[in-house]
């Protein structure tokens, strides 16, 4: 018997989903339906890994962002192949839950990071460490004012397990709501963690291979996790970056 199906397949890095938009859309939406049909046949639970990207660019009154926020997302941009296909995957999951009474849950991750990320990942933390190590430079895009909260995988995994096996609700944000930080300040933290004064921080324009219109802010409301599982993130950003530095120096 199969107790649980988790749909984790996808292309989450903006550089790569811009490069492969059709593959991205398929993985997040049509493959989701295939897995839902499989779960239905096997009578198993189903968990869809969605994304914080489904919220798009929330207005200030919706930050931190609750699961009930419906999103502000463009259907015709370089980011749409990812954002809208994740939304489609969520809709498929909702339909199977309601039409077929399938036991389903949706997880919306907010900027997980940690050991295992590749040097060519192109997302901000591995990218900043890679260029700091190889070029002694860190390049925040634009003015570097765009903010995120970063959740170390050590904090994320126990909550994923909790949601999969014990969660009472349908949709859960998983992330760290405590430390919203700009890309420029993140670069300064990484420079300090690296302990090398020779590392330069230089703002650059968005490269052509990077999707435009990225969200200006992203911060989750994790009240569902706090209420059900007494969730408190244990890894502060500085500590997490120190841990990632050891990994990056070894692997990058």
Q: What are the roles of these predicted feature ranges?
A:
Residues 1-27:
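NAD(P)H-binding glycine-rich loop region in Rossmannoid oxidoreductase-like domains
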Residues 66, 111, 132-252:
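C-terminal substrate-binding subdomain of Rossmann-fold SDR/epimerase-dehydratase oxidoreductases
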Residues 76-105, 132-134:
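Active-site Tyr-X1-5-Lys
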Residues 23-25, 78-90, 122-123, 149-150, ...:
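Short-chain dehydrogenase/reductase
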Residues 7, 33-79:
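Conserved Rossmann-fold NAD(P)-dependent oxidoreductase catalytic core, especially the SDR/UDP-sugar
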Residues 4, 23, 31-34, 45, ...:
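Conserved cofactor-binding/catalytic machinery of classical short-chain dehydrogenase/reductase
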């Amino acid at each position: 018997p199969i107790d649980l199906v988790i749909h984790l397949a996808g292309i989450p890095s903006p550089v790569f989903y811009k490069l492969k938009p059709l593959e991205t859309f398929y993985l997040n939406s049509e493959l989701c339906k295939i897995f839902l049909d499989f779960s239905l046949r096997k009578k198993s639970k189903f968990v869809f890994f969605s994304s914080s990207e489904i919220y798009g660019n929330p207005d200030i009154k919706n930050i931190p962002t609750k699961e009930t926020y419906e999103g502000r997302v463009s259907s015709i941009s370089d980011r749409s192949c990812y954002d809208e296909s994740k939304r489609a995957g969520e809709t498929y999951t909702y339909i199977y839950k309601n039409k077929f009474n399938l036991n389903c849950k949706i997880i919306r991750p907010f900027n997980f990071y940690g050991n295992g990320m590749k040097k060519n990942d192109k997302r901000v933390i591995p990218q900043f460490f890679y260029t700091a190590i190889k070029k002694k430079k860190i390049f925040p895009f634009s003015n570097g004012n765009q903010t995120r909260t970063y959740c170390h995988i050590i904090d994320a995994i126990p909550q994923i397990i909790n949601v999969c096996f014990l969660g009472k609700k349908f949709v859960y944000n998983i992330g760290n709501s405590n430390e919203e930080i700009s890309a420029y300040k993140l670069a300064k933290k990484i420079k300090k963690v690296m302990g090398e004064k020779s590392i330069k921080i230089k703002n650059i324009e968005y490269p052509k291979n990077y999707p435009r219109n990225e969200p200006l802010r992203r911060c989750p409301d994790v009240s569902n996790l706090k209420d059900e599982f007494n969730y408190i993130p244990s890894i502060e950003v500085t500590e997490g970056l120190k841990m990632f530095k050891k990994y990056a120096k070894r692997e990058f």
